Amino acid sequence: GVDENGKTLFVRARGKLKRDGELLVGDFVELSDSDGETVITKVCPRSNSLIRPAVANVDAIVAVIAPSPEPDLALVDKMLVNCKRAGIDCVICINKSDLGGVGPGEIEKQYGSDASAVVATCARRGEISELVAAIRGKLVCFAGQSGVGKSTLVNALTGEDRHKTGEISEKIMRGKNTTTSARI
């Protein structure tokens, strides 16, 4: 967990919370100390939540697509519908803009009225200013197909090498599921 000052805490869920799997990434919780351990005792009411990705209390989802692998626009459709239903902004981010392919204009035409913003980035080159402007001051979650550069974007935004990144498999032309965790 992360406390109100941004300090990382190691916490444990116990009892009903652990057994029933009621916790989501982004939940605000109450804690207590028990035998030298910090334990989650209560989940506070959520302002919003999604099942996929399994998150709570976010201001926006960044739906990341890229020219490679081929964009799954049905996935973008699902994210937009789920975000709208939950009252969460959805920013569509076209990463790897240096590779050509689908451009912001095409995506804007198709999704512009449903997305809170459509931005183009090239995380490997550090071209992320449009994304920074779209998410400034917001608690966001990145979602999208494997291999579109979600971890590379997070690394570029934080200035840290927090997340392992990989290449697109030439055999199957998809990402290799390098990142398999969720964290705030």
Tell me what each language-model feature is:
Residues 46, 64-67, 82, 86, ...:
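Conserved, well-folded catalytic cores of nucleic-acid-processing
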Residues 159-184:
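Switch I (effector-binding) loop of TRAFAC-class P-loop GTPase G-domains
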Residues 146, 151-152, 156:
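Walker A/P-loop
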Residues 1-73:
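N-terminal accessory targeting/assembly segments
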Residues 58-64, 85-97, 115-121:
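Conserved beta-strand/loop subsegment of P-loop NTPase cores
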Residues 74-84:
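Histidine-anchored nucleotide/phosphate-binding helix
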